[in-house]
Regions:
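ABC ATPase NBD Q-loop/coupling interface
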Residues: 10, 64-81
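Conserved ABC ATPase "signature" region
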Residues: 64-71, 109-112, 116-129
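Conserved short hydrophobic alpha-helix within the nucleotide-binding domain
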Residues: 49-50, 100, 104-105
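ABC transporter nucleotide-binding domains
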Residues: 78-86, 91, 122
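Conserved catalytic motifs of ABC-family nucleotide-binding domains
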Residues: 55-57, 93-102
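Short coil-to-beta microelement around the adenine-binding A-loop and adjacent beta1/P-loop entry
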Residues: 16-17, 80
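The feature captures the beta-strand-to-loop junction immediately N-terminal to the Walker
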Residues: 35-37
């Protein structure tokens, strides 16, 4: 069973063409290694699977990526739900390009907490620990 299906993926940082025509299928319950020199696009490609590159200004994806048969870049796809199901663990810390406060508050907000006073208290308490 195919878990991830990347079809004719091209990715750009501004005018820089970082990924060129990548197509691959990854079976469910398998291990895959992406090996290559620094700067060749491994992390860029992996970040496409939970749309972390959406947070970087002036980027563009061409092609399609399906996870469990769903096009994760289709209109109406809920990014928060996707990120709950597709996690990333990086060798080096990789905070979202936001303030420290917003990075810590992100987990609360993505889980539906809207009470700003509660969010502020929780973030401050967490940062003091």
């Amino acid at each position: 069973m195919i878990k991830i299906d990347a079809q004719s993926v091209d990715f750009y940082y501004g005018d820089f063409h970082a990924l060129k025509n990548i197509s691959m299928q990854i079976e469910a319950n398998t291990s895959v290694a992406f090996i290559g020199p620094s700067g060749c696009g491994k992390s860029t490609f992996l970040r496409l699977f939970n749309r972390m590159n959406d947070l970087i200004p002036d980027t563009r994806l061409e092609g399609k990526i399906f996870i469990d048969g769903r096009n994760i870049y289709s209109k109406g796809e809920k990014v928060d739900t996707l990120r709950k199901n597709v996690g990333m663990v990086f060798q080096k810390p990789n905070p979202f390009p936001k303030t420290i406060f917003e990075n810590v508050a992100y987990g609360l907000r993505v889980n539906g907490i809207k009470d700003n006073e509660y969010i502020e208290e929780t973030v401050v308490k967490s940062l003091k620990q």
